[in-house]
Curated annotation (Swiss-Prot):
Pfam families (alphabetical): SmpB (PF01668)
GO biological process, one term: trans-translation
GO molecular function: RNA binding
Species: Mycoplasma mobile (strain ATCC 43663 / 163K / NCTC 11711)
Superkingdom: Bacteria
Protein name per UniProt: SsrA-binding protein
Role summary: Required for rescue of stalled ribosomes mediated by trans-translation. Binds to transfer-messenger RNA (tmRNA), required for stable association of tmRNA with ribosomes. tmRNA and SmpB together mimic tRNA shape, replacing the anticodon stem-loop with SmpB. tmRNA is encoded by the ssrA gene; the 2 termini fold to resemble tRNA(Ala) and it encodes a 'tag peptide', a short internal open reading frame. During trans-translation Ala-aminoacylated tmRNA acts like a tRNA, entering the A-site of stalled ribosomes, displacing the stalled mRNA.
UniProt-listed InterPro entries: SmpB, SsrA-bd_prot, SsrA-bd_prot_CS
Chief location: cytoplasm
Subcellular location: Cytoplasm
GO cellular component: cytosol
Length: 142
């Protein structure tokens, strides 16, 4: 499992509750662009239509002279019971479904998605403060 890209904003802005692995339906030029790390997950999110999951706002740069939609919604490959379970939890608990990592798994590109709860500004400030305290203590002890 080789990670292609991480969604660092997701870990800062959300509290991760459950994680899932999903396959992606991609075109050839999209795979080539991803292989060259020309992909961004910042601002991407998961939507549901007709019991199918799609990733929206995932930016894949165009490969050479191939013309295609860079922000096109791409279908995720999940089992029906997984989709229903995620949708149910999302609607019942008002959670967000966000992408965490894009990675290679046996020559297939997979996406790790998560059910997440948004953090408040106070939570984010508290996290930054904890991080600073840890750094300060580390400097003092060494």
């Amino acid at each position: 499992m080789k990670i292609i890209i991480k969604n660092k904003d997701a870990f800062f802005n959300y509290e991760i509750l459950e994680k899932y692995k999903a396959g992606l339906i991609l075109k050839g030029w999209e795979v080539k662009s991803i292989r060259e790390n020309k992909v961004q997950l910042k601002g991407a999110f998961i939507t549901f239509k007709n019991d199918e999951a799609y990733i929206t706002n995932m930016h894949i740069s165009q490969y050479m002279s191939v013309k295609g939609n860079e922000l096109e919604p791409r279908k995720l490959l999940l089992n029906k019971h997984e989709i229903r379970h995620i949708q149910d939890k999302k609607n019942r608990n008002s959670l967000a479904v966000i992408p965490l990592n894009l990675f290679w798994d046996n020559n297939y590109i997979k996406l790790e998605i998560a059910l997440a709860k948004g953090k408040t500004k106070a939570d984010k400030r508290h996290r930054i403060l904890e991080k600073d305290v840890r750094k300060h203590l580390k400097k003092i002890t060494y």
